[in-house]
């Protein structure tokens, strides 16, 4: 859940790559089986174990429909870093997989009315949790504090430091698309939850 940075919309309990897409016919067949076998089961889109909010997952799912635009934005960002004044140790410390994980996190949860200082601090704290949960570069039992400090500093550089202008220039089109199409996904998600066989479950008002 914290090691694979391919598509974070799938990185949740019960998620798997085979669920990326399906056909209309297969979806209806699945719904009919569900109605026969478990007519009173819960239709959950969020639980206490969910790693991301429903709306963030709905936004990130859009990346699967715009891989070229996403790849272009990411490569532009990496190119801008190569020509920036970012301290070299930060670039050496932050591996590409962690970097991609955080980029998706940032654009998926991008706030409507951005208080970037607060947002940068929240993402920096979350970044430390991510690498500890991944247990590759750090962990809860044996934290690599130097790496974590570099990671948090890099996040703040990207969102409210010298890199912020470059970041928004690279990712503004992607964020705009995720916001618009993610809203459609969110509404569709709620519609399916309340109309498909089963009992809709709304976790903490979601």
Positions of predicted regions on the chain:
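Catalytic cores of glycan-processing enzymes that make or break glycosidic bonds
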Residues: 1-206
